[in-house]
Amino acid sequence: EIWIGTDGGGINILDPETRRFSLLEHMPGSDNYSLPANSILCLYNDCNNNMWAGSIRNGLISIREVSMKTYTDVPPGNDRGLSNNTVLSLFQESQDQIWVGTDGGGINSFNPLTEKFTHYSSTWEDKVASICQFTPGKLLISLFSQGVFIFNPATGEKQPFTIVDAKTTALLCNRGKAVNLLRNTHHNILFLGEHIYIYDLNTRTF
């Protein structure tokens, strides 16, 4: 199946064999079995084959065969929800850790076993457009209109990452844009913008 998030039309699910679509959408009065909203920004299939959806202003949605559950924003100091209700990006680092990039609330870490969130104040106000694994203990995060950064969850530190050179970095990141990140092999990370750049983790070169 191919899952497609739409802006207002819920989630369309394509069966490639039959070429037919099925639909997940918001149905008033059926909160446990329908989406909380129909505008979906990102989708992520985790290692347990559960689907996660990031919505516009309606939080993080856990989609399972028998039910759905939504996690929304909470006040600072509360670990039972998001730092911002709009979810731009998702990435699973391990079975008990899902990274959530929000639209202005920075990056959140979510443990699906305990259902607890960790917020990182150093990323507050950041719009986290994409997340991927960089090296053990560190992530690459793409911030809207700011660039790509190496993020250390242990310290909360963000270190700017240069894509090829300063000129290329500025063209890709600093004009109302964001780069999408994909670690497509153990050694390579794809930087997806106007062009595709391949970063080799072994040689640390593009």
Task: Give residue ranges: language-model regions.
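Carboxylate-rich, polar loop motifs that coordinate divalent cations or form catalytic acidic clusters
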Residues: 1-206
